[in-house]
């Protein structure tokens, strides 16, 4: 099961605290899907604000091969849709609202086209249902080329990445995925599989 965070009344619930769903009006639930190289945690501040007055429950999802999820050898929009439908069934979601950014926006659009019975309202940020030609190769190759054995801190990684990735805000966003595990830095996004799947992610699949 993919990982997710639940925000209600401005508070974070752990994933297994699901009993309150019985009382929740599903038309007031908003699922948030992050973009490429993102994670559910990126939306934490926004989710808290949106849920603060108690009128909406926000569920931010870590998509396949991102965030707190275990890595999988495959990555595509169809597989991400399967993950989300399994999550909906697990949470007993019948009809809900979706907010998707970038890759998550395409996922939300495809979900609404493929499984319209699940979607009440749709919000899309910073993406269109088209094939994109932008070259993500330099970004992902720069991340893959980083020798993590030489990295002692995020500052070390930032200095090396700055040679090829000039935009500091972009580097800070990407470096959120650099995690210290047992004294060694590791990527929290499955870069090798993402690179292999990039053509699929840049396209808008024909249904």
Protein language model features and the residues they cover:
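Active-site loop/oxyanion-hole signature of alpha/beta-hydrolase fold enzymes
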Residues: 8-11, 47, 52, 57-99
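Alpha/beta-hydrolase fold catalytic core
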Residues: 1-31, 52-56, 93-94
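Gly/Ala-rich beta-loop-alpha elbow adjacent to hydrolase catalytic centers
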Residues: 100-104, 108
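Alpha/beta-hydrolase active-site loop signature
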Residues: 37, 63-67, 129
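Conserved serine/cysteine hydrolase catalytic core
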Residues: 182-207
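Flexible "cap/lid" loop of the alpha/beta hydrolase fold
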Residues: 109-114, 120-152
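Serine-hydrolase catalytic-loop signature spanning alpha/beta hydrolases and amidase-signature enzymes
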Residues: 35-45, 58
């Amino acid at each position: 099961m993919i990982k997710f965070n639940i925000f209600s009344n401005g508070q974070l619930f752990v994933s297994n605290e699901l009993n309150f769903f019985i009382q929740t009006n599903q038309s007031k639930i908003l699922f948030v899907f992050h973009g490429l190289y993102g994670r559910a945690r990126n939306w934490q501040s926004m989710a808290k604000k949106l849920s603060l007055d108690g009128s909406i429950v926000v569920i931010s999802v870590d998509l396949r091969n991102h965030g707190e999820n275990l890595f999988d050898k495959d990555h595509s929009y169809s597989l991400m849709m399967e993950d989300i439908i399994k999550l909906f069934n697990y949470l007993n979601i019948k009809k809900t609202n979706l907010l998707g950014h970038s890759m998550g926006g395409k996922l939300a659009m495809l979900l609404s086209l493929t499984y319209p019975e699940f979607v009440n309202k749709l919000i899309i940020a910073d993406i269109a249902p088209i094939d994109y030609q932008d070259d993500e190769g330099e970004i992902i190759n720069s991340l893959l080329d980083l020798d993590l054995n030489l990295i002692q801190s995020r500052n070390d990684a930032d200095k090396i990445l700055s040679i090829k990735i000039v935009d500091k805000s972009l580097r800070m966003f990407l470096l959120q995925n650099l995690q210290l595990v047992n004294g060694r830095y590791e990527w929290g996004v499955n870069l090798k599989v993402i690179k292999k799947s990039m053509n699929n992610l840049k396209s808008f699949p024909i249904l």
